Amino acid sequence: MHQPAEVARALVALQGVGRDFDVSKPWLNRVVERAPRQLLTAVDDFSLEVRSGETVALVGESGCGKSTVARLIVGLYPPSRGRIEFDGTPQTAPASGIWSEGVRRRMQMIFQDPYASLNPRWRVTDIVAEPLRVQGSLARRADLQARVSELLTQVGLSAADGEKYPHEFSGGQRQRISIARALSSTPEFLICDEPTSALDVSVQAQILNLMKELQERLRLTYLFISHNLAVVSQMATRVGVMYLGRLVELADAAALFSRPRHPYTRMLLDAIPDLDMSGRPRTPVAGEVANPLAPPAGCAFHPRCPLANQRCRAERPKLSPAQGTLVACHAVEERRG
């Protein structure tokens, strides 16, 4: 299990962050049908700190809000409510999600699909150098070329690869190019949005090893988003479990994988194949995620939870300490499971 050299300050802090999307019908349809506007809450009351040097992973089923949190942090989406800070500095224009130029240089994002995130009409040199050109940090072309060659070598490619186009590379090599581009502005914080999910298993291991080496060498901080708990177990210092836009459990990786507290976390871990054939009882993930346009009252997980009671159906649980972890669950609080 990966551990940082030391636990330091909170580099990124989210406090009560929420994000709503307007999914209403067109205005004329609403007038004719006398229908109200409709909002979809993708993230709700989300609070998290990412400390310098660590890797925090966010896990959960598709549609739980993991990628929305990533886009809120980098400013691709403005938050509907709440506060986001980077190293103590809030967004300069929270309503539009804008960071100051100095903050933008210190955070970058690695996207999920290396086939879609690279411009097929650009050479690799231009792709990697784009952030440097935008920031104007290297004016001379010779300096720019030297920096690109250094970055490509750093991620396991050759300087000569800079003259090629993305279609000449495999999926794993394309993701290395994406990592080189993310590192070009010398960031401290990288958001990794399922960076290995589109890759073969053998290539996944190579990319994960590269990311761990770069973290140790460059003292990087990661927010690692994934639905693959086997990958998360190799990368994470702490793990946050999301369900329907809310954080339901946050714990050190070792504690979460050895003793999960929330029923949803247990179900996710039980879905991992048991290669040891231990014969331990397993609870499969039952049912489907609720409709986010009409979430259930109380705990959003109660329709799928074997431990749910009347309180779960009526009262939304808050994230509270429970034996060294943070859990939002009435059953854990009442020691029913």
Q: Where are the regions a protein language model picked out?
A:
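Conserved ABC transporter NBD signature motif
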Residues: 82-93, 103
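Conserved catalytic motifs of ABC-family nucleotide-binding domains
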Residues: 186
